[in-house]
Amino acid sequence: MGEVGRRLAGALERAGVDVVRVTRAAGWEQTLSADAGARIVCVGETQLAAVVERLRSVPPESLVFVQNGWIRPDLAAVAGHTRGLVWFTSKGEFFRSLRPSLFAGPLAVDMAAVLSAGGIAAEALDDAAFRAAEAEKMGFNCVVGLPLAVHGITLAEYVTRHLAEARAVFDEAAAVTARALGVAADPGWWADFLLAAEPLGWVKSGAPKALAYRNGAVVALARRLGLDAPINLRLLAAVAAG
């Protein structure tokens, strides 16, 4: 089980929820049972489409997806699900909640309540507020990843040495995603990013992951919408060039 799943499962158990840990090879019989409760899907973005297909017999209202990035196309077939945006970071024994994690959908209130009871701050949002939060989180994810890999430095070093580029990556990602979701980007998001990122100054990125769901998705959405995302495009080109 990955870090996100491990932390969520632990919080649920501390709140008194019975948790069945599901892996690629184990736990699926109970997951697909009509008697099962909520199913929280914690796989990486690149694995999501295959898991959604495997869950096709499960009622969408019992599904909770906590992936980052532009995953809406992968979830089109399961309308009525619950989405979560995780705002904590976990690596081994290290855990830090940066902000309350956010949920929207039929299980949002329950998820927020039990996770908060289990020690992970969480809130339920309506659809419009969640869309705005999704755009803001895309800005965060596009900075904390690809640019660090391109420059080979930590997040603190990146924000110090390349502040204008970091701001451009964030603003492009947030603005494009906000337009795609029909919400307005908030100029205050950048200041909030700097506050949330401060405890993560040590973070580095090796080979960037899931770019098609993050910076790559921003560039693709920008093209579709007639917008520009030149800094994200340049960083993607740098990775492609090796």
Which residues are covered by each model-predicted region?
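Generic structural signal for well-ordered, non-membrane alpha-helical segments
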Residues: 5, 104, 108, 135, ...
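Rossmann-like NAD(P)(H) cofactor-binding subdomain of soluble oxidoreductases
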Residues: 1, 5-13, 24-97
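Hydrophobic anchor at the start of a short beta-strand
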Residues: 16-20, 61-63, 122-123
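NAD(P)-dependent Rossmann-like dehydrogenase/reductase catalytic/cofactor-binding core
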Residues: 170-242
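Active-site-proximal catalytic alpha-helix in oxidoreductases
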Residues: 130-174
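Helix-loop-beta segment of a Rossmann-like dinucleotide-binding subdomain
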Residues: 89-100, 151-160, 198-205
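Rossmann-fold dinucleotide-binding core
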Residues: 64-137
